[in-house]
């Protein structure tokens, strides 16, 4: 051993690990290295959605052409639509069906009807409607069954499309005048069913045109007239054949009676709407309905009618007798009241009637 030199001993140095931990897979913030994987998954999802929608589109067009669904095809179509509802195309399914698929399918129906002329067109239209209402419409409802809770259902959209794209384009009004004697029952059914479908925005110009057609085949007819002088639609009763009725002459009291006119939009109730799904329950609160708050006026009107009929029945033998009602009779309408205004003492009402009859000269309503 040499003096002054220390022995050289081997020393092992352990390398410390990196402080950066591996990124967990469940973290939401992606990194640049994950971008190709995300793009591949997005492309696969788009291809799957495109394939699913192509299958739905092909099936719908085939139904309009008169074909049917294959075995287990309806289940596959429903699953494809459920998958589409969860994708980016979910909110556009109803709009695309209404503006693209339905218009394309009804185009074939319209061309089939326009090939015929005269009274043959009515017969072809009746056959087309029977097939559409019994075969095409139920199949469309079954295919788009997962699409629920929309503003308009698939059934309503299809019927409105048939009205606008088929019925109103074949100019049925002139043909109805020629075929009144042998009009097929399917035409009357078609007009009444299409009239029962209402747009959520109120009566449109197409709806008023449809009512003009219904008026030619249905009597009596209660519908909406297209008078533009009012702020809203007016309800009119139209008859094709007049009936003889007893003439009623109405004579007023000596005191003038002022008629109070109310805006039309306050008197006309909104039409009933057909809804499906959970959205109908959410909209129930906005539907205008009759309540028991107006029961007092109905009871008073019923009592008045009973008194008038009883008076006319007892005094039918005399010619110049009529029912007299005192001007002091309480008004039939009271606001902010939940109980009917019924007189506690009916004898007082009779005494008031006799006193007013003796004291003043009154006119009455006489039937001739």
UniProtKB/Swiss-Prot annotation:
Biological process terms in GO annotation: cellular response to oxidative stress; negative regulation of protein phosphorylation; negative regulation of signal transduction; phosphatidylinositol 3-kinase/protein kinase B signal transduction; positive regulation of intracellular protein transport; positive regulation of mRNA catabolic process; positive regulation of phosphatidylinositol 3-kinase/protein kinase B signal transduction; regulation of fibroblast migration
> Can you name a GO cellular component term?
TORC2 complex
Which GO molecular function terms does the record list?
Answer: ubiquitin protein ligase binding
Question: In UniProt terms, what function does this protein have?
Answer: Associates with the mTORC2 complex that regulates cellular processes including survival and organization of the cytoskeleton. Regulates the activity of the mTORC2 complex in a substrate-specific manner preventing for instance the specific phosphorylation of PKCs and thereby controlling cell migration. Plays a role in the stimulation of ZFP36-mediated mRNA decay of several ZFP36-associated mRNAs, such as TNF-alpha and GM-CSF, in response to stress. Required for ZFP36 localization to cytoplasmic stress granule (SG) and P-body (PB) in response to stress.
User: According to the UniProt record, where is the region Disordered?
Assistant: 327-368
- Provide the protein name: Proline-rich protein 5-like
Q: Which organism is it from?
A: Homo sapiens (Human)
Sites bearing Phosphoserine, chain numbering:
28
PANTHER family linked? PROLINE-RICH PROTEIN 5-LIKE, TARGET OF RAPAMYCIN COMPLEX 2 SUBUNIT BIT61-RELATED
UniProt keyword list: Phosphoprotein, Signal transduction inhibitor, Ubl conjugation
Q: How is the polypeptide modified once translated?
A: Ubiquitinated. Ubiquitination by RFFL promotes proteasomal degradation of PRR5L thereby modifying the substrate-specific activity of the mTORC2 complex. Ubiquitination by RFFL is stimulated by LPA/lysophosphatidic acid.
Positions with biased composition (Polar residues): 335-344, 357-368
């Amino acid at each position: 051993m040499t003096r002054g030199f220390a022995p050289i001993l081997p020393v092992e140095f352990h390398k410390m690990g990196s402080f950066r931990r591996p990124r967990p897979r469940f973290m939401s913030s992606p990194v640049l290295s994950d971008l190709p994987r995300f793009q591949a998954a997005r492309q696969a999802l788009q291809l799957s959605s495109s394939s699913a929608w192509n299958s739905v589109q092909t099936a719908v067009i085939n139904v309009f052409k008169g074909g049917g669904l294959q075995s287990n095809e309806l289940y596959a179509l429903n699953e494809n639509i459920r998958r589409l509802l969860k994708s980016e195309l979910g909110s556009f399914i109803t709009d695309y069906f209404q503006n693209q698929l339905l218009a394309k399918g009804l185009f074939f129906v319209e061309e089939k009807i326009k090939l015929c002329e005269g009274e043959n067109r009515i017969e072809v239209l009746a056959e087309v409607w029977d097939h559409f209402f019994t075969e095409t419409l139920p199949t469309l409802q079954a295919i788009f069954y997962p699409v629920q809770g929309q503003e308009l259902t698939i059934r309503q959209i299809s019927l409105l499309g048939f009205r606008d794209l088929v019925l109103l384009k074949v100019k049925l009004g002139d043909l109805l005048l020629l075929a009144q004697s042998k009009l097929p029952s399917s035409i009357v059914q078609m007009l009444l069913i299409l009239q029962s479908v209402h747009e959520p925005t109120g009566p449109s110009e197409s709806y008023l045109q449809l009512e003009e057609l219904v008026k030619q085949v249905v009597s009596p007819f209660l519908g909406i007239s297209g008078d533009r002088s009012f702020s809203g639609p007016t309800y009119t009763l139209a008859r094709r054949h007049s009936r003889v009725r007893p003439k009623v002459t109405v004579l007023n009291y000596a005191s003038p009676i002022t008629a109070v006119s109310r805006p039309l939009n306050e008197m006309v109730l909104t039409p009933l709407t057909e809804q499906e799904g959970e959205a109908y329950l959410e909209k129930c609160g906005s539907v205008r309905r009759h309540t028991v708050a107006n029961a007092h006026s109905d009871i008073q009107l019923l009592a008045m009618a009973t008194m008038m009929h009883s008076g006319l029945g007892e005094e039918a033998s005399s010619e110049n007798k009529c029912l007299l009602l005192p001007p002091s009779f309480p008004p039939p309408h009271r606001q902010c009241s939940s109980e009917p205004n019924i007189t506690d003492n009916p004898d007082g009402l009779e005494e008031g009637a006799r006193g007013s009859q003796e004291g003043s000269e009154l006119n009455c309503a006489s039937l001739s």
